[in-house]
Amino acid sequence: MEIAVIGNSEFILGFRLAGIRKTYAATDDERLHEHITSVLQDPEVGILVLNSTDMERLPRRLQSTLENSVRPTVIAIGGSEGDMSLREKIKRSVGVDLWK
């Protein structure tokens, strides 16, 4: 299972430096949508990391698909959703509340 990261070049740089190979630079909304569609179809990806501002720019239907996705589990970083959203996603993905 691999981690994929989609975002602007500044957002994905740290993930590249940490050794994540599947990083995709999205310079505009069209590229963002293309990369997300591609990653959702990749059976090797277990976690998809997005910038929360990119997530907010997506059409509501795609946002809903990503929010409800279990494989890959989609994590939006940097927004006001905070720990509760991440907690719920991990609980849904793993089946156990790791915070308890």
Curated annotation (Swiss-Prot):
Pfam families from the UniProt entry: ATP-synt_F (PF01990)
Membrane topology term reads: Peripheral membrane protein
Q: Where in the cell is it found?
A: Cell membrane
Gene Ontology cellular-component terms for this entry are: plasma membrane
Q: List GO molecular-function terms, semicolon-separated.
A: ATP binding; proton-transporting ATP synthase activity, rotational mechanism; proton-transporting ATPase activity, rotational mechanism
Q: What is its main location?
A: membrane
Report TM segments: none
Report which superkingdom the organism of origin falls in: Archaea
Ordered alphabetically, the record's keywords are: ATP synthesis, Cell membrane, Hydrogen ion transport, Ion transport, Membrane, Transport
GO BP annotation list: proton motive force-driven plasma membrane ATP synthesis
How does this polypeptide assemble, per the annotation? Answer: Has multiple subunits with at least A(3), B(3), C, D, E, F, H, I and proteolipid K(x).
- Main function: Component of the A-type ATP synthase that produces ATP from ADP in the presence of a proton gradient across the membrane.
Q: Which HAMAP family match?
A: ATP_synth_F_arch
Q: Which family does it belong to?
A: Belongs to the V-ATPase F subunit family.
Q: What NCBIfam families does the annotation carry?
A: PRK02228.1
- What name appears for this protein in its UniProt entry? A-type ATP synthase subunit F
Q: Which organism is it from?
A: Methanosphaerula palustris (strain ATCC BAA-1556 / DSM 19958 / E1-9c)
**Gene that produces this protein:** atpF
